[in-house]
Amino acid sequence: AAAAPAHDHASHAHDHDHECGEACGHDHSHDHEPGHVHSFPDARGIYLISPSSAVRDPQTVELARERLAAQGFKTALDRTALAEHQRFAGTDAQRLASLTRAAKQKLPIVMVTRGGYGMGRLLHLVDWKAMADSGKRFVGMSDFTAFNLALLAQTGAVSYTGATAIYDFGGKKVDDLTEALFGEVMRGELEILSFETQDADPVDCRGILWGGNLAMLASLIGTPYMPKVRGGILFLEDVAEHPYRIERMLIQLWQAGILGKQKAIVLGRFSDYKLAPHDKGYDLHEVVAWLRKTVKVPVVTGLPYGHVATKATLPIGQKVGIATEKGLAHLVLDEHHH
């Protein structure tokens, strides 16, 4: 369950011949709703910020910038992106100011260098309306889930989760699929993300796509930064969490009334954990079985998303479709109805 998917586990296409969502009884008058995918041919500029943990090796950021440049992206580094204060990338005031600068500068994409910890300290200080009004495509992962969800809860604006500078572009090699999907999503070109699923309930519906890191999601329950999404498509991942800890957070989401209101629960990768002799057969499969039995919402596994090399960049807060067939799931990001 923790293995990174092979390259053929996910594919991307520019056309499709099935309409996802008929079974949900929706009409198709959503083409001009907020959150609909638009084409962004100008998406060639990236402003890099560090709102969470400190960057310990600046060379990883330089390498990421070189690789992004090779993909045709112009990059700019925020003045405190390499700052250090304790475990953080600068003081709270410095990190908050970097978000404000990011919203005001000219480049269309704002990408975090890395996750870690620290975004939660800033949620009550951020001018969320200014973030939404900036029209920037904010993209991050892990700890940045707190920003993604707070922006959605406070404004309804769409932001992105997936690629980050250091993890995906600053390491030994760049995953081809991660790179391609990031570019396509930033340009508004990705219409369908199809991926292999070994374990999926039948589902064919539309709803708001939301989620991200499970621990961050659980940490926002009961706060003004937790979106109130009904009939959504909730996707989840986590790293270095034992299955019982994953289950405990899922129980919290369920008992808080959140899981039961969704149309589908999509599981990404839960990576880097070790089972113990005490588990005696209890593993991630048991957690998924418990989830299905208890929550009674369709569950789809295998989403290429998480703390793994091959990952999709996904829009949080956008209306999407999801459909499953034998061994495959299709996440429909852009639906054309002629």
Residue ranges and their predicted role:
Residues 2-38, 338:
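Histidine-centered metal-binding segments
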Residues 35-106:
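ATP/NTP phosphate-donor binding region
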Residues 104-109, 262:
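Short acidic/histidine-rich motifs immediately flanking catalytic phosphotransfer sites
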Residues 109-120, 125, 141:
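N-terminal glycine-rich "phosphate-gripper" loop used for MgATP/nucleotide binding
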Residues 128-150, 158-164, 298:
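Short, acidic/small-residue loops that bind anionic groups at enzyme active sites
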Residues 156-222:
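Conserved anion/nucleotide-ligand pocket segment
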Residues 228-284:
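Internal helical hairpin/lid segments
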Residues 269-338:
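ATP/nucleoside-binding phosphotransfer catalytic cores, i.e., glycine-rich phosphate-binding loops
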